[in-house]
């Protein structure tokens, strides 16, 4: 096969150009996303111009935002290194299940995680009861340490998975050679493991840092006063307590600049993770077979599992006892959340499919879908509020705007997964389909959708679960009649009805996991082609 001038095989370039799927859905989706994101940004920027310069409290919120994100990233990555190393060195029953559970906090509703952390680390939690029994003073969870604790709970599994992938990328033959040379664990760390860590750690830390900059719900529930206020929480307070739209716009611009800078840096620090070729054998670590190191790794894995699973167990335990305490508003809010989640899922997959089919021929189109990574949902919500407020009561649009923003926030994940699979389908089957004259709807129905079904199911489950637990834009727009389940839980916590909040938290956890399981299983069932 003769290469084309750009160095790619001619048949592959031809297939990429001749997918025979229309361009107009992708163009409309791109224009829609530009209007949805750039319009609110323009509104925020224009309003901020008349809102004056940031005051001392705004700079304090900026400093706290950066401080908690830095601490969260450093602690998460520092703890993830020994946990990932222990998982890389050991094989034990349930290891695969444990690694799978490391992904659970990603789809766990934030408000549910907060309830679990309060049950363990709060004033009446298990830890403080134990300290009181030992005659030691209680610990406080509210403030900087509470925010950092919650962020470590969410991001320790993510950092562990990322670093574990780096360990698994080291060829097993290198560890075999190290064992034949009699290398000690310290020498293996210095020669084999440290070069990998030096490559992987900066990217992992920056991703965690960027995620912690936009964690609104954690700061709202565990912030603990003006000294522990993030920029997003300050935006919320400017709306709900002062209704100072000018100051909210100024804060939104500060948040926008900070998040874009962090996202750009995280994307730039994306080093290659290849550490040489091998035969893809399972790693065996002869240098780590001493009783001391085996015990050390077992303790690390056990502590990490307890830290992650104990709050979830506490949610189930306390929630089961509080199910009968839930008011009728909780069930109404659950129905509202389900509707918002399903609408967001349909919107997200529709946009992702439209953009992915166009990105096959025009790769730059993928950038439209990735804009959601760099923009805080509260910034978009602020801009939409400024746009619609002169014409209509924003509370009337609360649920629709929430579903729309949730879809945009989940779009980068769905688009990336769908596009990668779509490229593989076209490169593998596209040439034959084109020769058979399969175009348009026929090609989509018989070639693409059956092979995309598992990815579509996983993407739908992820979007539905994330939307179900979102507590962001709805907090800006909603009134007493339009509350989602996370917002209703927050209101119950504010009224000190913790038993009812625990029951509602268990309901939210069950619904989120059920949505993810139903969509993911629906995508995998009968999907073999």
Region locations from a protein language model:
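Transmembrane alpha-helical segments of polytopic membrane transport and secretion proteins
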Residues: 1-29, 90-94, 186, 266-303, ...
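Membrane-water interface segments at the C-terminal ends of transmembrane alpha-helices
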Residues: 19-50, 56-168, 196-223, 248-267, ...
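Conserved MFS/SLC helix-loop-helix module at the cytosolic interface between two early adjacent transmembrane helices
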Residues: 89, 93-94, 173-176, 180
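Glycine-rich helix-loop "coupling/hinge" segments at transmembrane-helix boundaries
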Residues: 119, 217-243, 470-498
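The alpha-helix within a helix-turn-helix
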Residues: 178-179, 432-434
